[in-house]
Amino acid sequence: MDLSAIFLGTGGSVPSARRSTASVMLVRGGRRMMFDCGEGTQRQLQRSVGLAQVDEIFLTHFHADHILGLPGMLKTYDLTAREEPLTIYGPRGLHDLFKTLGRLIGRTDFALDLVELDPGDAVPHDGARVEAFAVEHGMRANGYALIEEERPGRFDPEAAKRLGVAEGPAFAALQRGEEVEGSDGPVRPEDVMGESRQGRTVALTGDTAPCHSTVSAAADADLLIHDASFSEEEVQRAADTGHSTVGQAAAVAREAHVKMLALVHISSRYHVGTVLDEARDVFEPCVAPRDFDVIEIPFPERGEPTLVPNGAREGSNGPSGTLSEPVKEPEAAE
C-alpha cells in the first residue's frame, strides 16, 4: 500500500510568493487525510493533485494560518455537489470554532461531522490508526501520528509443501491465519510464515515548542514533520511563542530516532540552505520541503523515505495513488 506526504503549505504564519500557509496531505492507498487547512489550501490542491475529495481533515489547533482555508474549501465542495460525508477532527474547541465558521459556510448538502480529540484518542483506519498527542503551543493543540499495524510475515510455500500442505485453498487459509491439515497432522500459520513485518509511522506536530510527547509519539518513525519557525539566533522568541528553532526540531528527531525529518512552518525571512545547514549539524537525514514537494514512504524492508521535488506539481504524474477524477466546476449563477 502506497504512502505519501504531499506538502501543500510549508510556510510560516504569513504566506509568501513561494510558500503557502500550513497544510499537509497524507495519502495511504486511496485514502486522503489532510492535516491543517491554511489560507489558499484549495488553490494549492487545484495546482497539484486536483481538488480531490479529501476523506478527512485533522486540525492541530485553531490559529488562523492553520484553518482559514476551511470555509472556502467546504463551500466549494458544496457548490460542486459533494455527496460523501466529511469528518473534521481537532482539539477541544472544534465545535465552538464551527459556530463561527458555520456563519460563513452556511448549510452544506453533504454530511459534515465534527469530532474533538484529546491526546491519546485514536481514529481507526484499515490496518492503521491516527493518534492524537499533546504538543506545547500555549493553547489546546494536538500533534498526530499515523501508525500502521504490524503486517504478517512472508508466506514460505516450500515450507508448506514440505509439511504436506497441498497448493490451493490451504495455502490461502494459512496466509489468513488459519490452521490446515498437512501430511503428518495440523500445520499452523507460524510454521510457514516469517516474522511479522513492521508498519510505518508518520508524525506531524503542527506548531509546537520541543517536547517529550513528540519524542514519544515519533519514536522510530519513518517521517517526522516538525515546526521549524526560527533560527537558533531566536531561541528565546521561539520559547515565548510556543514554536521550535530549526536545531530544536533536529534534536527532537535525533532523540526519537526517526528515519527522516521534514522541517515546515519556515519563515520567508530565512534562506532554506541556511535552515538545512543548522538542522544537519544536529541531525543529518533532514529535508525542508517546498510547496508541492512529496515524500514517498515505502515499507521499511523496501528502503528509506524519499523526497520528490515538485512531485505533486500540476502537469507532473504526481505520487502514486494520489490523482483522482477532477471535481466538476459549478454552473454559473443566473
Region roles according to the model:
Residues 125-133, 299-310:
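Short, surface-exposed amphipathic charged segments that create phosphate/polyanion-binding patches used
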Residues 5, 36, 45, 61, ...:
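Divalent metal-coordination and catalytic microenvironments
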Residues 15-17, 126-216, 223-225:
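Active-site-proximal loop/helix segment associated with metal-binding centers of metalloenzymes
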Residues 39-89, 111-118:
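Active-site metal-binding motif and surrounding structural segment of the metallo-beta-lactamase
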Residues 174-296, 323:
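Cap/insert and terminal regions of metallo-dependent hydrolase folds
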Residues 1-50, 83-85, 144-146, 153, ...:
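Conserved beta-strand hairpin/beta-sheet module of binuclear metal-dependent hydrolase folds
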Residues 69-77, 101, 271-280:
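Metal-dependent catalytic neighborhoods of phosphoester/phosphodiester hydrolases
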Residues 317-334:
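Long, low-complexity, intrinsically disordered segments
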